[in-house]
Amino acid sequence: MNYNNLLQVCSDIHLERDDISDISKIIIPNAEILVLAGDIGNPMTSIYNNFLDYYSKLFKIIFIITGNHEYYGNTIIETDKKIEEICDLYENIHFLNNKVFKYEGILFIGTTLWSLIPEDYTVYNQLSSMNDFKLIKKFTLDEYRKLFINNIKFIKDNLEVNSIIITHHAPSMICIAEEYKGDKVNCCFASELDKIFMDDNVIGWIYGHTHNNLSLITQKKFMYSNCYRTDNYNKSGTII
């Protein structure tokens, strides 16, 4: 599988932390398409806008996926609307919020995904203290689960030959770092979607969120993450 430096991935930059002095040093352009797989920053801030404006000039296409952190401080609807407004300013930036984009015979399927939280009240009690439910306005556990169900349906309904799925949350428990294996809150980071990944139509799955980078690449498929705030983040890394 080789498309000659078609895709470059970055996620979990967290521009909202205000500790990045030079946005030009975050990514070294090395591909046609930049995939921003969530938790890039707060879209209500100038640094988020400046970041997209800068890299829009360096890539042919940019795909944006929202992570959970983009929504902190606002509602889901308010945040999505703001990102749409920003992306509308650029011909080459596309917000794949339950949307698809076809390029060079590849169908890119984008969604935040969220994750499968089991109907277990013990787990519910643990999860209710997480920031997603404190900092995203009008956001509940039930809403979280509904979003996941809807996003999975969106992925399945749109699969076709040569599909690459782009999500923020991880598609498999193999994406979880070894030291966190078995933790009950892993259900907020990854879901067991290996069956979808192994579908003959799927050639790749890009994700973020776990802050644990994975590069699983075979002749027919890849599963890949490149989170910014990690020791092995690759500024110029490409997948295919």
Question: Which stretches of residues belong to each language-model region?
Answer:
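Active-site-proximal loop/helix segment associated with metal-binding centers of metalloenzymes
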Residues: I109-D183
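N-terminal active-site segment of His-dependent metallophosphoesterases
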Residues: M1-I64, E70-E78
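Active-site-proximal beta-strand elements of phosphoester/diester hydrolases
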Residues: N4-H14, G105-W114, I164-H168, F222-Y228
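Active-site environment of divalent metal-dependent phosphoester hydrolases
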Residues: H14-I20, G41-S46, H69-T79, V100-K102, ...
